Amino acid sequence: MMRPVVVKEKQLNKSQIHAVEDEVRQAKTMDRDIVTHAMKQSVAKLNPKVMIKNPIMFVVEIGFIITFILSFLPSSSSSIPGWFNITVSLILLFTVLFANFAEALAEGRGKAQADSLKQSKKDVFANVVKENGDIVQVSATDLRKGDVVIVKQGEMIPNDGEVIKGLASVDESAITGESAPVIKEAGGDFCSVTGGTMVVSDEITIVITSNPGESFIDKMISLVEGAARQKTPNEIALNTVLTSLTLIFLIVVVTLPIFTNYLGFQIDTAVLVALLVCLIPTTIGGLLSAIGIAGMDRVTKFNVLAMSGKAVEAAGDINTIILDKTGTITFGNRMAHTLLPVGNETIEQVGKWAAISSVLDETPEGRSVIEYVQGKSISYNRELAEQGEFVPFKAETRMSGVDLQDGTKVRKGAVGAVIEWVESQGGTIPKDVNQKADLISKEGGTPLVVAVDNRIYGLIYLKDTVKPGMRERFEQLRQMGIKTVMCTGDNPLTAATIAKEAGVDEFVAECKPEDKIAVIKAEQDKGKLVAMTGDGTNDAPALAQADVGLAMNSGTTAAKEAANMIDLDSNPTKIIEVVGIGKQLLMTRGALTTFSIANDIAKYFAIIPAMFTLAIPQMEALNIMKLTSPLSAILSALIFNAVIIPLLIPLAMKGIAYKPMSSNALLSRNLLIYGLGGVIVPFIGIKVIDIIVGLFI
């Protein structure tokens, strides 16, 4: 009888357990430090020079000062007890402190991230290559743009640059958090290196691309600390509306005593201040800055560096996303799948010239051709190719190859491009070239034509696959009202097959860099906001033109400088998540604004009857909450007004839950939850507070 096999779960050893416990303990300590710092900052921000930047809370602070002074200047004509003024002033003080705490807490999280980044900025020495070839050691702070530096295994890259010689594995965990090293090599779109990262194997020569204080890490520190944070257009517009409302209510409250005197009664100053504070939108006024800062923080936690809050907001308003096929929609590892000879050519001839065209080609496709030919034991003259002059692939020509020493020109590339090249040299095109190219394209592959001078030998079948789950993600974007456009250098048949399989709305085949700009401009001319991803120098113009340009951290310096967002993980599909974060930011701001304004309805029913009931008994009909007394009603409304701010801080920091759906459906949902909820919650809250306050009055 067979004994049952017992599979044991993998157990953590003691050192691993202690390491995890240390990380948890450090995280708790950091959170505690952030909260402690935020509490101190909330007091420091009481400085009027700081408070005036938030007009709504500045008015509340002025109210606190007035009521605090009145607490020590008793009036014989006032019917309000002395303790009332001091109580109102304390409630107003806490209202301002809670608002300051929300902003300081959001800023504190950014500061914590900045501190961790500063740790990666160590003072290192760089091996600078002088013009005469001598190598001199200098401090990284003395490096300037254009300096050439050699970085060896185990050394830290001293500043941002581009690899001009060599190939090395680089540990970028200090920047990206990803422990797996990445390959950096001269030429192509993966030559960019970042200061503060470590070379873990081999040796590279780089040219410095930034001066001290201008490096990628310097920019990250500046952004996450908030030094470079400016209010976004939407934030400014909302702030203007809220400030205007505050000004209107201020005028109403200031002129109110004129009318009450005419009616034969007076309203105490503390009551007028309480009325003003309850009328103005203090909830959103206290949380507005925190929402914006937290939105940037969420993007940063997602390993995306946003150059401004405007970029994050623009992501939330995106109508069209331009996506590259290779590496974004598909895995991007197009490998040689088979060789197809044309006319009377043989597979050995196709393999021979395909290999010769690829010997000096360091792209994954070129290497896969060599591997395929060697795997099929097809012979070719490697030295012949190595002695020739390599012709790199260009987006404009859509071909690559080699010019041999005897004048022979070998090319491989897109069907249309190679056919045009052969015809320009007087060659004839075999009848089955297009037929076999179409067959490859219909299967979702990419055909590359192999030609020597004016003669076509055959085709290379490159195979790529669509990433799983892409169709579902594009369907989510469609539900959000966002159109997807796939740009690819493939021929129309291949592009159509991939587009259908992935579920994109439109595609642009045989796309050149200028075509991307044309697509972006065409969408923008329709009044739409456009997002796109890119990593190459040829993507830079389109990234700059797009409303949201997401560059890959592994890409070139030109691409990163042109974009307004950089993905530290170099994952092009992350643009979809960035759009979601942008929408979440806008929705959070809108929802809390709706909630704040809806709150005022309950406050009106609490404080207005309390002010006028004694002089106008008919106003008692408005006391639908049956509050204990006029003083209790005023204090209850003020306490709720203050307490709701810290209660909403987690929501402001985290953002409201977002589900892909149409704009109309989102509007209806949020109006129901935050509009109706904004009316109901304060009715309940004020009544509960009134019951408690009534026990002490």
UniProtKB/Swiss-Prot annotation:
It catalyses: K(+)(out) + ATP + H2O = K(+)(in) + ADP + phosphate + H(+). It is a multi-pass membrane protein. It is found in: Cell membrane. ATP binds at D361, E365, F393, K394, A395, E396, T397, R398, M399, S400, K412. Its EC number is 7.2.2.6. Coiled coil: none annotated. Mg(2+) binds at D535, D539. Keywords: ATP-binding, Cell membrane, Ion transport, Magnesium, Membrane, Metal-binding, Nucleotide-binding, Phosphoprotein, Potassium, Potassium transport, Translocase, Transmembrane, Transmembrane helix, Transport. Its main location: membrane. It is an enzyme of class 7 (translocase). InterPro entries: ATPase_P-typ_cyto_dom_N (IPR023299), ATPase_P-typ_P_site (IPR018303), ATPase_P-typ_TM_dom_sf (IPR023298), ATPase_P-typ_transduc_dom_A_sf (IPR008250), HAD-like_sf (IPR036412), HAD_sf (IPR023214), P-type_ATPase_bsu_IA (IPR006391), P_typ_ATPase (IPR001757). It comes from the Bacteria. Belongs to the cation transport ATPase (P-type) (TC 3.A.3) family. Type IA subfamily. Part of the high-affinity ATP-driven potassium transport (or Kdp) system, which catalyzes the hydrolysis of ATP coupled with the electrogenic transport of potassium into the cytoplasm. This subunit is responsible for energy coupling to the transport system and for the release of the potassium ions to the cytoplasm. This is Potassium-transporting ATPase ATP-binding subunit. The gene is kdpB.
